[in-house]
Amino acid sequence: MAALTRQRAGESGVPTELHQKYYSQRATAGLVVTEGTFPAWTNRAFPGQAGIATDEQAEGWRAVADRVHEEGGTLFMQIMHGGRTSHPDLIDGANPEAPSAFDWGGTVRGFAGKMDAPVSRELKKEELPRIVCLLYTSDAADE
């Protein structure tokens, strides 16, 4: 089953019973790829997006994985860096980080609704290992 981003985790980013039910119902597909999951608070892309940045979020995903495994499926987490699709409203007032500071003129969704997309903060070359580490290890609960 292909990945998607369902935006059903609420402000906490913690997967819920709804996530457990949704993914376990699809476990017979074999390999189930989760929704785009943010690895750190500064990488959140959407309101309601599930994360793996805290112990509570990790526990929520563990419960989802357990349910999928009970149904015979395999779960693979899609780690997603929000980049310029984010908004300061979602990331504690921080400016979204992206490959370049680019005003793409679009709109994004925050907790306050639809808003103009901000110009993101351009990542510096020396910051890339941090991003790669988050995406590669998803050991974000320590951040």
Language model segments and positions:
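General "foldedness" signal
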Residues: G13-P15, A45-F46, D89-G93, Y136
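Phosphate-binding glycine-rich loops and adjacent basic patches that engage nucleotide phosphates
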Residues: Q20-V32, D89-W104, D142
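Conserved small/polar residues in nucleotide/adenosyl-binding loops
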Residues: Y136-D142
